[in-house]
Amino acid sequence: MAHILMKQLLEAGVHFGHQTKRWCPKMKEYIFSERNGIHIIDLQKTLVKLEEAYEFAKEQAKEGKTFLFVGTKKQAQQTIEEEAKRCGAFYVNQRWLGGMLTNFTTIKSRIDYMIKLEELKNNGYFDKLPKKQANRLNRELEKLIKVFDGLRGIERIPDVLYIVDPKREEIAVKEANKLGIPIIAIVDTNCDPELITYPIPGNDDAIRSIKLITSKIADAILEGRDLREKEADLQLKDEDLQSEIS
């Protein structure tokens, strides 16, 4: 993993947890101390867990697995979109619809419908309709884009989820756990880390904290995909060499 300094974590405020009265006792092992009614996260443990999550994401990407980034809280929306696009992951940053994983066939049909409506609009079909009908379809398309824009091109249930604030995204967590999909997540002091396959203890409210950790997971995916491409190139060269010899 690209080296992360303790200073970076401190500057990003990764160590600031929630109020002590809002804590989840299962986070006890990741808490360093209490300050002014706020739990302070043990950043040494954050580094260890981030390293584990990084290696897992890298290996999954190397195997060609697909990723879905989830973070619908205001502080996470921009980072989730930017980092998912940067590493070629799908994303949900506006609203998690119940059944996005457990009722994927229906969700996929809505995504296909959104794309079909876009094609009709771009081809000028809406312009030929009565104004009232065209306005209705435009509103419907806007709503679909808001929810499904980050899922364009998805063909099957994703292999790995990355989540900012699993407490807020509890429906996504439940669906992933039901289907046995591994989860990487930033877990603040009010979260249950036992629900997460690769928990990363950290502040899930500060934009800089979210950005720092999310960017590292995106880096891991990019590194894994780069390794996959290099291995594929080597295999092709070996096959070419074997054919020349024979």
Swiss-Prot record:
Record's keyword terms, sorted: Ribonucleoprotein, Ribosomal protein
Record GO biological process: translation
Coiled coil feature spans: none
MF terms (GO), sorted A to Z: structural constituent of ribosome
Source species, domain of life: Bacteria
Pfam families xrefs: Ribosomal_S2
Ribonucleoprotein listed as a keyword: yes
GO cellular component: cytosolic small ribosomal subunit
Family matches, as InterPro entries: Ribosomal_uS2, Ribosomal_uS2_bac/mit/plastid, Ribosomal_uS2_CS, Ribosomal_uS2_flav_dom_sf
Family designation: Belongs to the universal ribosomal protein uS2 family.
Stored PANTHER family: 30S RIBOSOMAL PROTEIN S2 PROKARYOTIC AND ORGANELLAR, SMALL RIBOSOMAL SUBUNIT PROTEIN US2M
UniProt-recorded name of the protein: Small ribosomal subunit protein uS2
